[in-house]
Each structure stands twice: as structure tokens, then as C-alpha cells.
């Protein structure tokens, strides 16, 4: 998605060699110029549209593919970005930005070795380019770190961070005046104090943070992979989508819709962290409410509650900056126990991403998923976190490069087989904060307004009433936040403007 303000801006490139000026090629250049203007205005969808039209007229121009690849990167369509970058290189092996684009796409997909190969190519061609060297060195560090982690994982049985913690011996210093758990328990007073403390940009004491993490892990690991909830006719529940570290917008949700309680239950549908630079504040607030109301405050896993995403998009860096690497490891353990889906009254299924790459998946199949792991590259767990709907029937290759895209016929068949009415998912920015697709059978909700301080989108949350379960949408807009830019803790390669 769009980068934070203040980062090095990478603009769509203008072709160096003007093609022959016949009518078709001239029109392609005009379309490319229009696309560049949309790109500069951060209207990436229209930029993609006009680059695509230029490509139709002149499919042999590598720069058109390179430019569209960058626009796809901005809209998180990493699979499409990878394809365009590869095509640009095929057309012109000397087109260096094609290698940059492909490396960025592979980085976004967690394919660090493939990214390193492309950075290595750039360094060989431009050995004196400091920027290229820096990107190569940073990517090389990640590859070595991943290799080290794999070696450790293969040499010993997995040991929980909890086993190495001695929370009781942690001392809360006299000068700390912030919120503390009461007799080791989260209370409503603690939660109100915590939100105000965070609003004032202060840090929760590490002992309290560890207490919350250890306790919420105990709660989550007892849950089913598919949480099943019954609403009485007079009861309602609020469903929120991605919040992505936008803490002040989370506070606004509670201001507009009321604090969580036993009579005001919530479901937060994944992607609590990354991108926004208040992810620690968001996730500890959500975990606190989960401890306070374990049966009325629900958290589902998103594709950003995973190590690969956290390493790139900021959460790992943020936890290390505000606390320690050990605490990040504990967050990672806790994320692995987050449920993957929730079913309301046996009729509405909620998951972060969407439906499946293969037919015939049942609710019982979801229940049987062993979720306590990093997600695989394919299969039902991957699909629940990563897939997206598409308007045409059938399935197609994912624009993200992970999982699939599924059409209205796929949704209809899944719902009929499992006796469901519709699904609610998140995972995608929507200009109005929500979208109803597939004939009302596939609803998207997104709760991070003006995503990354750049997209200008509204956000929304959904009310479901037990009496009819029809989604009632409530839109809201972004509120001011302190001058800490999104992606402030993201991987150095992101901060260098490569994504």
C-alpha cells in the first residue's frame, strides 16, 4: 500500500527512448502519461487502468510493465506486481528497475532469497550505487537471519517464551505512575486508565505487558479454531475489520459505539498490527479486553498476525523498539493461538481473508485445522487468512500471490453446503469502508480510515442483531493522531521506498 509521508518517493518512470510516433504508439504514450499523473496523485486504481490500456496498445514496452508493477505494489497486489516485473525483465534484461520491482514483490511475499538474487543483479550492474548496496545488504541480513532461525528450529524442540519468564521478579519502579493490573487481573478501571495512558503516548510497564500476554495465551489456546456464537433475538454484536495499528481510530470506534462489555460484544477480524505505528497500543488494548470479557470480546487471526508480515511491515520492529525481542517472540506465540473463523447463529461465517482454493470445505474441516503455527503457503488455513473475492465466477490466481480469488458461484456453493446465509471478511481497503458483493453473500468490512495516512478511505463496523442477522453498516472517518508516521518501525527496505 502507499508509503508513509517523508519516505523517499519512487515515481513511475518515463521511457527513455521515444517509440516511433505512429498513431498507436503515440496513443500508448498519452495513456502512460495519464497513468503517471494518476500515480502521482496516489490514485493507483486509475493508474493501473491506464497503464493497462497503454500495454494493450504497445505490449513490448518494458517500462509500462515496470510502472504498472509499482502501482500494483502500492495496492498490495503483490502477485500481479511480481508478474509485471518479470515480464518487464523478459522484454528488456537491462531494465534495472524491473529487478527492483521484482525484488520488492518477492520481499512482500516473504520470498527473501528470490529478492536477494535480484538485488545481487542490480549491484553487479551498478557496483557504485549506494542505494543498491544498502538494499542488497539489508536483504542479505534477512536471508541469514531466516537461515539461522530454521537451524535453531531443527536442532531443538520448541520451547515457549513463557517458560523462560519470571514475571514475579520483575519490579515496577516507584517512578512509574501508569496503570497496573489489580492483583494480577485486568479490570475495567485498568482498561480505561490504559487507553488514556496510551492516548497520552506513554508506555505500559513491561511487567504489565507480559502479564497480559501470558494470560491471553492461556485464554486463546483453549478456544476452538472455529468459534461458535449464539445471539439471542434482542442481542447485537459489532464486527470490526482491519485496524492496522491505528490506535486513535480504535479509540474512536469505542467512542462512537461504546466500550466493550457483556452487553456490547465485539469481534475484531484480524490485522490488528503492522503499518500503523501504534500497533503495540492497539494489540495490548484488544488483548486486555479479551481478558476482561473472554466470552464477549472476540479476536480472529489475520494474515498480519504472522512472522513474515511482522518482520517486514513494522510490528516486530515496534515491539523491539518499545520493549524487547523476547516480547516479540511471545507475541508471535500468542498470535498462533488466535482462532481463524467465527460462526454466528450457524448462519454467518466470519474470517479475515475468505473462502477456499478447493471445493467441498466444511465447517468441520475448519474446526479441525491445527492453527498453532505459522500459516502454510497453501491449504485451508492459508485461504482463510489470504484469499479475496472476485466478481467473475470460478477461481483465479491471487492478485496478492498467495491463496486464490473466488467468485460468486464459489461463495454460493460453499454457503449452500454449510447451510450458511453469507460471509463477512476484511483484508481489503474499501473506499466506503465496506462492500457487499456476490449478490449479498460476501461482505467486506474495513475499520482503518485513511489507511496509512494516504488512502482517504472511510472505515466502517457492522452491527448484527440476533433477530435477523442483517448487516447494518456504520461508517466513520479518521481522527487526528500524534505526529508518528505509519511504517515508522517497518523494515529498512520499506523505509527506503522499495515497496
Curated annotation (Swiss-Prot):
Induction: Does not show circadian oscillation.
Cofactor dependency: Mg(2+); Mn(2+)
Positions that bind substrate: 244, 275, 303-304, 400, 427
Subcellular location(s) per record: Nucleus; Cytoplasm; Cell membrane
This protein's GO CC annotations: cytosol; nucleus; perikaryon; plasma membrane; protein folding chaperone complex; protein-containing complex; proximal dendrite
Catalytic EC class: hydrolase
A Gene Ontology BP annotation from the UniProt entry: cellular response to cadmium ion
Binding site for Mn(2+) 2: 271, 303, 352, 427
Cofactor note: Binds 2 Mg(2+) or Mn(2+) cations per subunit.
Activity regulation summary: Autoinhibited. In the autoinhibited state, the TPR domain interacts with the catalytic region and prevents substrate access to the catalytic pocket. Allosterically activated by various polyunsaturated fatty acids, free long-chain fatty-acids and long-chain fatty acyl-CoA esters, arachidonic acid being the most effective activator. HSP90A and probably RAC1, GNA12 and GNA13 can also release the autoinhibition by the TPR repeat. Activation by RAC1, GNA12 and GNA13 is synergistic with the one produced by fatty acids binding. Inhibited by okadaic acid.
Gene3D superfamilies to which the protein is assigned, alphabetical: 3.60.21.10, Tetratricopeptide repeat domain (1.25.40.10)
Residues with N-acetylalanine modification: 2
CDD domains registered for this protein in UniProt: MPP_PP5_C
UniProt keywords, alphabetically: Acetylation, Cell membrane, Cytoplasm, Hydrolase, Magnesium, Manganese, Membrane, Metal-binding, Nucleus, Protein phosphatase, Repeat, TPR repeat
Active site: 304
Catalysed reactions listed for this entry: O-phospho-L-seryl-[protein] + H2O = L-seryl-[protein] + phosphate; O-phospho-L-threonyl-[protein] + H2O = L-threonyl-[protein] + phosphate
Residue span of region Catalytic: 184-499
Subunit architecture: Probably forms a complex composed of chaperones HSP90 and HSP70, co-chaperones STIP1/HOP, CDC37, PPP5C, PTGES3/p23, TSC1 and client protein TSC2. Probably forms a complex composed of chaperones HSP90 and HSP70, co-chaperones CDC37, PPP5C, TSC1 and client protein TSC2, CDK4, AKT, RAF1 and NR3C1; this complex does not contain co-chaperones STIP1/HOP and PTGES3/p23. Part of a complex with HSP90/HSP90AA1 and steroid receptors. Interacts (via TPR repeats) with HSP90AA1 (via TPR repeat-binding motif) or HSPA1A/HSPA1B; the interaction is direct and activates the phosphatase activity.
Protein name, entry field: Serine/threonine-protein phosphatase 5
Protein source organism: Mus musculus
Lineage: Eukaryota, Metazoa, Chordata, Craniata, Vertebrata
Annotated gene: Ppp5c
Amino acid at each position: 500500500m502507499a508509503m508513509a509521508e517523508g519516505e523517499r518517493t519512487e515515481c513511475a518512470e518515463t521511457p527513455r527512448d521515444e517509440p516511433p510516433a505512429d498513431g498507436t504508439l503515440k496513443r500508448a504514450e498519452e495513456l502512460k502519461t495519464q497513468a503517471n499523473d494518476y500515480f502521482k496523485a496516489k490514485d493507483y486504481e486509475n493508474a493501473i487502468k491506464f497503464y493497462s490500456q497503454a500495454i494493450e496498445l504497445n505490449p513490448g514496452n518494458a517500462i509500462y510493465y515496470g510502472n504498472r508493477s509499482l502501482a500494483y505494489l502500492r495496492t498490495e497486489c503483490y502477485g500481479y506486481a511480481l508478474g509485471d516485473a518479470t515480464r518487464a525483465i523478459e522484454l528488456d534484461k537491462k531494465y534495472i528497475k524491473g529487478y527492483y520491482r521484482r525484488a520488492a514483490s518477492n520481499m512482500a511475499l516473504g520470498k527473501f532469497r528470490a529478492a536477494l538474487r535480484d538485488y545481487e543483479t542490480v549491484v553487479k550492474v551498478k557496483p557504485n550505487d549506494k542505494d543498491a548496496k544498502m538494499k542488497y545488504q539489508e536483504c542479505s541480513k534477512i536471508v541469514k537471519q531466516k537461515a539461522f532461525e530454521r537451524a535453531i528450529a531443527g536442532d531443538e524442540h520448541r520451547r515457549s517464551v513463557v517458560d523462560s519468564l519470571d514475571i514475579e521478579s520483575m519490579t515496577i519502579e516507584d517512578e512509574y505512575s501508569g496503570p497496573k493490573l489489580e492483583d494480577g487481573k485486568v479490570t475495567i478501571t485498568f482498561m480505561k486508565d490504559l487507553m488514556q495512558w496510551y492516548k497520552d503516548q506513554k508506555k505500559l510497564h513491561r511487567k504489565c505487558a507480559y502479564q497480559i500476554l501470558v494470560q491471553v495465551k492461556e485464554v486463546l489456546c483453549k478456544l476452538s479454531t472455529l468459534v461458535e456464537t449464539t445471539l439471542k433475538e434482542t442481542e447485537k454484536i459489532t464486527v470490526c475489520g482491519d485496524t492496522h495499528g491505528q490506535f486513535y481510530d480504535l479509540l474512536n470506534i469505542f467512542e462512537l459505539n461504546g466500550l466493550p462489555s457483556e452487553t456490547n460484544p465485539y469481534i475484531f477480524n484480524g490485522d490488528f498490527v503492522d503499518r500503523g505505528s501504534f500497533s503495540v497500543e492497539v494489540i495490548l488494548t484488544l488483548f486486555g479486553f479479551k481478558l476482561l470479557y473472554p466470552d464477549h470480546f472476540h479476536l480472529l487471526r489475520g494474515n498480519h498476525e504472522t512472522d513474515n508480515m511482522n518482520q517486514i511491515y513494522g510490528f516486530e520492529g515496534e515491539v523491539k523498539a518499545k520493549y524487547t525481542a523476547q516480547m516479540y517472540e511471545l507475541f508471535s506465540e500468542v498470535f498462533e493461538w488466535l482462532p481463524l473463523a467465527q460462526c454466528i447463529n450457524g448462519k454467518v461465517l466470519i474470517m479475515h481473508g475468505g473462502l477456499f482454493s478447493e471445493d467441498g470445505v466444511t465447517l468441520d474441516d475448519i474446526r479441525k485445522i491445527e492453527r498453532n503455527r505459522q500459516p502454510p503457503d497453501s491449504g485451508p488455513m492459508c485461504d482463510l487468512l489470504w484469499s479475496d473475492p472476485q466478481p467473475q465466477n470460478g477461481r483465479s490466481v491471487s492478485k496478492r500471490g498467495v491463496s486464490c480469488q473466488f467468485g460468486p458461484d464459489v461463495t454460493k456453493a460453499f454457503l449452500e453446503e454449510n447451510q450458511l446465509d453469507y460471509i463477512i471478511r476484511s483484508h481489503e481497503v474499501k473506499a466506503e469502508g465496506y462492500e457487499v458483493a456476490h449478490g449479498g453473500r460476501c461482505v467486506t468490512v474495513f475499520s482503518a480510515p485513511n489507511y496509512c495516512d494516504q488512502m482517504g478511505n472511510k472505515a466502517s463496523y457492522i452491527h448484527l442483531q440476533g433477530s435477523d442477522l442483517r448487516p447494518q453498516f456504520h461508517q466513520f472517518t479518521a481522527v487526528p493522531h500524534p505526529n508518528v508516521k505509519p511504517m515508522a518501525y517497518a523494515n529498512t527496505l520499506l523505509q527506503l521506498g522499495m515497496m
